[in-house]
Structures are given as C-alpha cells and as structure tokens.
C-alpha cells in the first residue's frame, strides 16, 4: 500500500495558553507552515495558531 499524502499536524496557540488543535495537512499542496486564526477557549478570543510537530 502506498503511504497517504496527508500528515497529522498540531496547531498551537500563539497566546501562550498551551491550547492546541490537531488536524491533517496535504504536504504536497502546502509545503509551508500553516498559520490560521481560531478560537482559544482559555484566552476566550480568536488568536493565531501556528503549526508545530506532534511529539
């Protein structure tokens, strides 16, 4: 079987709260690091989430 093109990534809050989301990303279409605005329930506002590695 061939390996899939989608890899699991972790989106970590830049607010410093330690909150994170997990999602998948197609490495062929998006080789750069992802940054997206999402809601941080700890900070109770929308903040930027940056891609980090899943340990």
Curated annotation (Swiss-Prot):
<dbReference type="GO" id="GO:0003735">
    <property type="term" value="F:structural constituent of ribosome"/>
</dbReference>
<keyword id="KW-0689">Ribosomal protein</keyword>
<feature type="compositionally biased region" description="Basic and acidic residues">
    <location>
        <begin position="1"/>
        <end position="11"/>
    </location>
</feature>
<dbReference type="InterPro" id="IPR038584">
    <property type="entry name" value="Ribosomal_bL33_sf"/>
</dbReference>
<dbReference type="InterPro" id="IPR011332">
    <property type="entry name" value="Ribosomal_zn-bd"/>
</dbReference>
<feature type="region of interest" description="Disordered">
    <location>
        <begin position="1"/>
        <end position="24"/>
    </location>
</feature>
<dbReference type="GO" id="GO:0022625">
    <property type="term" value="C:cytosolic large ribosomal subunit"/>
</dbReference>
<keyword id="KW-0687">Ribonucleoprotein</keyword>
<dbReference type="Pfam" id="PF00471">
    <property type="entry name" value="Ribosomal_L33"/>
</dbReference>
<dbReference type="InterPro" id="IPR001705">
    <property type="entry name" value="Ribosomal_bL33"/>
</dbReference>
<dbReference type="GO" id="GO:0006412">
    <property type="term" value="P:translation"/>
</dbReference>
<comment type="similarity">
    <text>Belongs to the bacterial ribosomal protein bL33 family.</text>
</comment>
<protein>
    <recommendedName>
        <fullName>Large ribosomal subunit protein bL33</fullName>
    </recommendedName>
</protein>
<feature type="compositionally biased region" description="Polar residues">
    <location>
        <begin position="14"/>
        <end position="24"/>
    </location>
</feature>
<dbReference type="InterPro" id="IPR018264">
    <property type="entry name" value="Ribosomal_bL33_CS"/>
</dbReference>
């Amino acid at each position: 079987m061939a390996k899939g093109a989608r890899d699991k990534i972790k989106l970590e809050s830049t607010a410093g709260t330690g909150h994170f989301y997990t999602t998948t990303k197609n490495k062929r279409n998006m080789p750069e690091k992802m940054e997206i605005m999402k809601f941080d329930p700890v900070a109770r506002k929308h903040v930027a989430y940056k891609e980090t590695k899943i340990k």
